[in-house]
């Protein structure tokens, strides 16, 4: 898909989200820059999860209005929750995904009633060279989100430069290593692992090193730098 596919429509937030009594609404500071509005805790968790992945270029809330005809023959307008732009591994092309965030019990219960607007969203996305996906808890509140929330607390931990520099130097020099193998290479003494583990979590949280965030974080976790990943 071309990185220019967004040029076919004007992509911007078309609907502002106000306070709601039925769910939690607010704004999330995406990568410390733009504030992205959400209107449920599930939408907030979607933003937290996808902020971590470097291939996510941007997320636009309430991005487009899509006209559709309901089963009753009346005209309506549907606004998906987000437009997510992802960069392919080659770093050149960009993929765009229209996203609807919905709890599983709601979309299962209302699938037939909502099918007209979702079919319209798929048609609209296809015409733009995009795709349309529905995200429920199974795609958002997974192991990756648990790990991301666990690491978040370590972003603000003060680190001894000697620990982080030693770990980074080893990964730059040798390449991907498990956490246990990295500790062994750096001469970490048994019983003294705690500050070194905190340094690992800090480096992961601040994205100076990487791992497969979808897997459990433990001694077998493979770590690498962006240089040798």
Model feature map: region roles:
Residues 1-229:
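Electrostatic, structured charged patches in enzyme active sites and in nucleic-acid/phosphate-binding
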């Amino acid at each position: 898909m071309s990185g220019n596919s967004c040029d076919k429509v004007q992509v911007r937030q078309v609907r502002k989200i106000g306070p709601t009594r039925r769910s939690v609404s607010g704004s999330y500071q995406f990568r410390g820059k733009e504030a992205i509005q959400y209107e449920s805790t599930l939408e907030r968790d979607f933003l937290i999860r996808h902020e971590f992945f470097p291939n996510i270029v941007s997320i636009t809330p309430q991005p487009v209005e899509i006209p559709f005809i309901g089963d009753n023959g009346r005209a309506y307008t549907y606004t998906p929750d987000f437009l997510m732009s992802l960069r392919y591994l080659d770093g050149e092309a960009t993929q765009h995904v229209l996203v609807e965030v919905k709890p599983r019990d709601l979309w299962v219960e209302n699938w037939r009633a909502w099918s007209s607007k979702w079919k319209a969203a798929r048609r609209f996305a296809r015409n733009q060279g995009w795709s349309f996906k529905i995200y429920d808890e199974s795609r958002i509140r997974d192991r990756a989100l648990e790990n991301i929330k666990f690491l978040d607390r370590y972003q603000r931990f003060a680190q001894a430069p000697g620990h982080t520099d030693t770990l980074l130097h080893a990964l730059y020099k040798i390449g991907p290593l498990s956490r246990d193998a990295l500790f062994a290479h750096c001469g970490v003494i048994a019983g003294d692992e705690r500050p070194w583990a905190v340094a690992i979590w800090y480096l992961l949280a601040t994205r100076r090193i990487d791992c497969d965030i979808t897997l459990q974080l433990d001694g077998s976790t493979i770590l690498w730098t962006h240089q040798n990943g």
